[in-house]
Design a protein with these regions (language model features):
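Positively charged n-region of N-terminal signal peptides that target proteins for export
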Residues: 1-4
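C-terminal motif of bacterial Sec signal peptides marking the signal peptidase cleavage site
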Residues: 14-17
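OB-fold nucleic-acid-binding modules
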Residues: 19-98, 102-382
Length: 382
């Protein structure tokens, strides 16, 4: 019966499962219902793995299944009495985390994303709170894996098996009945926030939680210098298929260099709300960008019919701002729905005269290092 319920929930999640940032309610609902704090000594009957051990077992299972090059869509459906535990390191209060939270075993180990599938999680899952996760019936996957010489590892995450497994390996849990049988909160009065770990070297392109203690963890990196580069993927129509070339506009440094535009396409904020998107669009700074990816070109944004369509379908967009330091490149990725999306990056940072110290969750995407801020206070100009 448990398997049937999980399968039905996964099918329902298909309608809403997506890795794109979405609007997050950042207010406060009525006080949550009281719950009985979880007592692991009474309730945990199986084996408790560390997050690193779980990640290593996932990689091993993928190898056994001959799926080491298919990690983008392959997942391990756990059918053993296995558990993980950890303290919550993130909050969705600022809107930069969507339907999930991260946990760490301790300050020295890696972390992992728990794809709960609910919004306003900060009301029920507090930073520093210990949670236990029953893995039996859930799926372990990896988001952001890309095969080939130009790819690399992503980040191991926990959710349900994605029903389609075409774009993603896992989906959000979402169903409260299933959440309550897998995600267990310990005493809310025992909050012990994990301290950020200072790192001076970045993980390599082939690292995930199985091989690097920094992946999924709350870290602090100092001395990051702006690289005059940003990445934004804009859709001509957000209601149409987002994998069609004729619906996509890649604002990348490579494309900017081809047309003599700034490497960041003039995007000097951490992300962009709908109003900020329109401000950038109407300024003309993107007029030389074109619809389509690679060699495809379905017209420049300067064309009235294309700009008009973008104006009518305006939306908030995530942005990755690039910085160099710690022996490599770091993308600071921010949601267009975060409270600080339109916050201007300091001019002295943009012109390279000052660097920043940043704290956030370190993740891997196609072999590149990304950092997700918890709030705007995670950036300090040096």
């Amino acid at each position: 019966m448990k398997r049937i319920i999980i399968a039905l929930a996964a099918a329902a999640a298909l309608l809403t499962s997506c890795e794109e940032f979405q609007p997050v309610f950042t207010g406060k609902y009525d006080n949550p219902e009281a719950y009985a704090p979880f007592d692991p000594e009474e309730s945990v009957t199986g084996t408790v793995l560390t997050i690193k051990e779980l990640s290593q077992r996932f990689i091993s299972k993928a190898s056994e299944a001959g799926a080491s090059e298919q990690l983008k869509t392959w997942c391990w459906e756990v059918s053993e009495d296995l558990w993980i535990k950890g303290r919550i390191t993130t909050s969705d209060r600022s809107g930069n985390f969507y339907k999930s939270f991260y946990i760490q075993d301790d300050a020295n180990g890696p972390g992992i994303e728990i794809k709960v599938g609910r919004t306003s999680l900060h009301n029920d899952y507090k930073v520093g709170q210990m949670v236990y996760i029953s893995l039996d019936g859930l799926a372990v996957g990896e988001y952001g894996y890309k095969s080939g010489s130009y790819g690399g590892q992503g980040s191991v995450q926990l959710g349900l098996k994605d029903p389609q497994q075409i774009k993603y390996s896992t989906s959000y849990i979402e169903d409260q009945y299933i959440i309550d049988r897998h995600v267990f909160r310990c005493d809310v009065n025992d909050l012990q926030p994990i301290a950020p770990r200072k790192i001076s070297a970045l993980p390599g392109k082939n690292d995930c939680q199985a091989t690097s203690d920094a992946v999924g963890a709350l870290v602090t990196i100092s001395g990051l210098k702006y690289a005059d580069e940003a990445f934004t993927l804009v859709y001509l129509n957000g209601n149409e298929a987002n994998d069609k070339s004729e619906n996509r506009i890649f604002l990348t440094k490579d494309n900017a260099d081809k047309v003599g535009a700034p490497g960041n396409w003039g995007v000097t904020t951490w992300a962009m709300s709908k109003s900020k998107f329109l401000e950038y669009l109407n300024s003309g700074i993107w007029d030389k960008a074109h619809v389509g990816g690679g060699a495809d070109n379905f017209g420049e944004l300067s064309k009235p019919e294309i700009k008009s369509q973008l104006q009518g379908n305006a939306n908030a967009y995530s942005v990755s701002q690039y910085f160099t330091g710690a022996g490599g490149t770091v993308q600071i990725r921010t949601s267009g729905y975060s409270k600080f999306a339109d916050l201007q990056i300091a001019p002295e940072v943009l012109n390279g005269s000052k660097t920043i110290t940043v704290t956030g969750i370190l993740t891997m995407y196609q072999g590149g290092v990304q950092l997700i801020l918890r709030d705007q206070d995670d950036v300090v100009v040096e």
